[in-house]
């Protein structure tokens, strides 16, 4: 018998004689170390983002949750429906369609909070949307998957990792709450922390993508259709989220916030669900899709950020946004404008 055709017993994903992700000791150690480091860094970044959240505004979004409702409709209405349409349109395999839908049903990721800061978004709305979408995902993910996946698979076979969702919620709420307290007690120190954290957050987003590429570099053999869907999906999320928020009468800075919350998904949660729910043979077909989505959602978010910065430099202050903020918000200057001296309310 030809031993070369035997799958490596240490492989993590195998199909017959195909081993697409043999796990070396280096990969195993790197995975544990980087997961630990990234988790700690993410908690610190979310703490710094909390330093830009004001309690009375955060509670105001919960009492008058129009922005949160729009975000909810985008997160658990637009994204699953878009995933379903793309899956049918491209005629992908049932197991691949299910993974696309799992990605679309995931709540927003913490990267959206970091990007919302950089595009002068509503940080209070961003954090409240991420918190609410993660909490609501406990019920909405099973419901959306039941509705959209039953033409391909029994939704009961999909394992929802409620412990991971709970961990994500705790990892978001606790650091942000501490940051809010620091902002309340020591606003000057909070400004410094926010500046450092916003830069660290931008670096962290890139670092997560690079680490993912290193850890799963041998799993990049995947059907071209999934590459195309992974490219279109985040663009659709950003565009449709922005459009729906604008149709709902939200001001421009909140439209940017909702767009980011819609397009930037929790890809780590999707990867966890995929690994818990599928056999090694099926994983061979879909394992890399969450990472593909993650790369393109970050890439397009960076493009949008660059376009926004260029627009600000070319056009200066936006009088339309100033009028909208005066008419619709009637809120005092937030800590974001105070922190970034040159930014005025009309730019938010």
From Swiss-Prot:
<dbReference type="InterPro" id="IPR038770">
    <property type="entry name" value="Na+/solute_symporter_sf"/>
</dbReference>
<keyword id="KW-0769">Symport</keyword>
<feature type="transmembrane region" description="Helical">
    <location>
        <begin position="285"/>
        <end position="305"/>
    </location>
</feature>
<feature type="transmembrane region" description="Helical">
    <location>
        <begin position="158"/>
        <end position="178"/>
    </location>
</feature>
<dbReference type="InterPro" id="IPR004710">
    <property type="entry name" value="Bilac:Na_transpt"/>
</dbReference>
<keyword id="KW-0812">Transmembrane</keyword>
<protein>
    <recommendedName>
        <fullName>Ileal sodium/bile acid cotransporter</fullName>
    </recommendedName>
</protein>
<comment type="function">
    <text>Plays a critical role in the sodium-dependent reabsorption of bile acids from the lumen of the small intestine. Transports various bile acids, unconjugated or conjugated, such as cholate and taurocholate. Also responsible for bile acid transport in the renal proximal tubules, a salvage mechanism that helps conserve bile acids. Works collaboratively with the Na(+)-taurocholate cotransporting polypeptide (NTCP), the organic solute transporter (OST), and the bile salt export pump (BSEP), to ensure efficacious biological recycling of bile acids during enterohepatic circulation.</text>
</comment>
<keyword id="KW-0325">Glycoprotein</keyword>
<feature type="topological domain" description="Cytoplasmic">
    <location>
        <begin position="50"/>
        <end position="81"/>
    </location>
</feature>
<feature type="transmembrane region" description="Helical">
    <location>
        <begin position="196"/>
        <end position="216"/>
    </location>
</feature>
<feature type="topological domain" description="Extracellular">
    <location>
        <begin position="103"/>
        <end position="126"/>
    </location>
</feature>
<keyword id="KW-0445">Lipid transport</keyword>
<feature type="modified residue" description="Phosphoserine">
    <location>
        <position position="335"/>
    </location>
</feature>
<feature type="topological domain" description="Extracellular">
    <location>
        <begin position="1"/>
        <end position="28"/>
    </location>
</feature>
<keyword id="KW-0915">Sodium</keyword>
<dbReference type="GO" id="GO:0016324">
    <property type="term" value="C:apical plasma membrane"/>
</dbReference>
<dbReference type="GO" id="GO:0008508">
    <property type="term" value="F:bile acid:sodium symporter activity"/>
</dbReference>
<feature type="region of interest" description="Disordered">
    <location>
        <begin position="322"/>
        <end position="348"/>
    </location>
</feature>
<feature type="topological domain" description="Extracellular">
    <location>
        <begin position="179"/>
        <end position="195"/>
    </location>
</feature>
<feature type="transmembrane region" description="Helical">
    <location>
        <begin position="82"/>
        <end position="102"/>
    </location>
</feature>
<feature type="topological domain" description="Cytoplasmic">
    <location>
        <begin position="148"/>
        <end position="157"/>
    </location>
</feature>
<comment type="similarity">
    <text>Belongs to the bile acid:sodium symporter (BASS) (TC 2.A.28) family.</text>
</comment>
<feature type="transmembrane region" description="Helical">
    <location>
        <begin position="127"/>
        <end position="147"/>
    </location>
</feature>
<feature type="topological domain" description="Cytoplasmic">
    <location>
        <begin position="217"/>
        <end position="224"/>
    </location>
</feature>
<feature type="topological domain" description="Cytoplasmic">
    <location>
        <begin position="306"/>
        <end position="348"/>
    </location>
</feature>
<feature type="glycosylation site" description="N-linked (GlcNAc...) asparagine">
    <location>
        <position position="10"/>
    </location>
</feature>
<keyword id="KW-1133">Transmembrane helix</keyword>
<keyword id="KW-0597">Phosphoprotein</keyword>
<dbReference type="InterPro" id="IPR002657">
    <property type="entry name" value="BilAc:Na_symport/Acr3"/>
</dbReference>
<dbReference type="Pfam" id="PF01758">
    <property type="entry name" value="SBF"/>
</dbReference>
<keyword id="KW-0739">Sodium transport</keyword>
<feature type="transmembrane region" description="Helical">
    <location>
        <begin position="225"/>
        <end position="245"/>
    </location>
</feature>
<feature type="transmembrane region" description="Helical">
    <location>
        <begin position="29"/>
        <end position="49"/>
    </location>
</feature>
<keyword id="KW-0472">Membrane</keyword>
<keyword id="KW-0813">Transport</keyword>
<keyword id="KW-0406">Ion transport</keyword>
<comment type="subunit">
    <text>Monomer and homodimer.</text>
</comment>
<feature type="compositionally biased region" description="Basic and acidic residues">
    <location>
        <begin position="322"/>
        <end position="332"/>
    </location>
</feature>
<feature type="glycosylation site" description="N-linked (GlcNAc...) asparagine">
    <location>
        <position position="3"/>
    </location>
</feature>
<feature type="topological domain" description="Extracellular">
    <location>
        <begin position="246"/>
        <end position="284"/>
    </location>
</feature>
């Amino acid at each position: 018998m030809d031993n070369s055709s035997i799958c490596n017993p240490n492989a993590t994903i195998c199909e017959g004689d195909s081993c697409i992700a043999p796990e070396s000791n280096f990969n195993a150690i790197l995975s544990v170390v980087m997961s630990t480091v990234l988790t700690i860094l993410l908690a610190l970044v979310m703490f710094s983002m909390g330093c830009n959240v004001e309690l009375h505004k955060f509670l105001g979004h919960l009492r008058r949750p129009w922005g949160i409702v729009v975000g909810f409709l985008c997160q658990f209405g637009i994204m699953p429906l878009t995933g379903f349409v793309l899956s049918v349109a491209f005629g992908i395999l049932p197991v691949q369609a299910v993974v696309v839908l799992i990605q679309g049903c995931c709540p927003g990721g913490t990267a959206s909070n970091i990007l919302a800061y950089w595009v002068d978004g509503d940080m209070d709305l961003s954090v409240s949307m991420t918190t609410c979408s993660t909490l609501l995902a406990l019920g909405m993910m099973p419901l959306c998957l039941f509705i959209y996946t039953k033409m391909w698979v029994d939704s009961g076979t999909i394992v929802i990792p409620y412990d991971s969702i709970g961990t994500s919620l705790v990892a978001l709420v606790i650091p942000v709450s501490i940051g809010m307290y620091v902002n309340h007690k020591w606003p000057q120190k909070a400004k410094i922390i926010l500046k450092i954290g916003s830069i660290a957050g931008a670096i962290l987003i890139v670092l997560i993508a690079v680490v993912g590429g290193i850890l799963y570099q041998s799993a990049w053999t995947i059907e071209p259709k999934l590459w195309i869907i992974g490219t279109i999906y985040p663009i659709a999320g950003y565009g449709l989220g922005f459009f729906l928020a604008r149709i709902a009468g939200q001001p421009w800075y909140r439209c940017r916030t909702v767009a980011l919350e819609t397009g930037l998904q929790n890809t780590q949660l999707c990867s966890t669900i995929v690994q818990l729910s599928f056999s090694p043979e099926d994983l061979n077909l879909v394992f890399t899709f969450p990472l593909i989505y993650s790369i393109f959602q970050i890439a397009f978010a960076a493009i949008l950020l660059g376009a926004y910065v260029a627009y600000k430099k070319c056009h200066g202050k936006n009088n339309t946004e100033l009028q909208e903020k005066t008419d619709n918000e009637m809120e005092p200057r937030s800590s974001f404008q105070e922190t970034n001296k040159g930014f005025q309310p009309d730019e938010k």
